[in-house]
Amino acid sequence: MLLRDLVLRHGCCWPSLLLHCALHPLWGLVQVTHAEPQKSCSKVTDSCQHICQCRPPPPLPPPPPPPPPPRLLSAPAPNSTSCPAEDSWWSGLVIIVAVVCASLVFLTVLVIICYKAIKRKPLRKDENGASVAEYPMSSSPSNKGVDVNAAVV
C-alpha cells in the first residue's frame, strides 16, 4: 500500500523500480557464483554439497576480564584480643528513672487540675436567664449587686 502510494505520486519512479526488481535476483546469483562448494555432510557424495563462502568467519574476540573486587574505604579493624570496656549501665538507669519521675509529676498535676475543675460549682441561671457564677468566696445571696448582663426593663 505504501509502495503503491509512493509510486503513484511520483510517476518517474517506475523505471527505477522495475530496474531494481529485475537486477535484484541477478545480484544474488552473482554472489552465489563467487562462492566455493564445500562438503559438509558425514557421507561424501555429489548430492551433499553446500555452497559456502571461501573464508571462515573471523573468531570472536576474547571476553573482557572480570572487574577487580571493590576496595573497602574503611580502615582495617585493629587486631586486639582484649575486650573493650563496657559502658556503665547506670547512665541508662538514670535516664529511665528521670523519665518515669517526670511522667508521674505530669500525671499528678493533670489529676489535680481535673479534680478542681470537676469540684467547681456549675453556673446557675439568674431569674432573667443570665448565667451567674457561684464561687465559694463570693458574698452572701442577700447582698446582690447589679448584674452587668441584666437587661433594664
From Swiss-Prot:
Spans traversing the lipid bilayer: 93-113
Biased composition (Pro residues): 59-71
Location within or outside the cell: Cell membrane; Cell junction; Synapse
Annotated glycosylation sites: N79
GO biological process: establishment of localization in cell
InterPro entries recorded: PRIMA1
N-terminal signal peptide: 1-35
Gene Ontology CC terms: anchoring junction; membrane raft; plasma membrane; synapse
Single GO MF descriptor: enzyme binding
Extracellular topological intervals: 36-92
Record keywords, A-Z: Cell junction, Cell membrane, Disulfide bond, Glycoprotein, Membrane, Neurotransmitter degradation, Signal, Synapse, Transmembrane, Transmembrane helix
Topological region Cytoplasmic: 114-153
Domain PRAD: 56-70
Known tissue expression: Isoforms 1 and 2 are expressed in the adult brain. In matured cortical neurons, only isoform 1 is detectable.
A Pfam family it matches: PRIMA1
Major location (coarse): membrane
Keyword match Ribosomal protein: no
Disordered: annotated span: 59-79, 133-153
Comment field on protein domains: The proline-rich attachment domain (PRAD) binds the AChE catalytic subunits.
Self-association state and partner proteins as the record states: Interacts with ACHE, probably through disulfide bonds.
Protein's UniProt name: Proline-rich membrane anchor 1
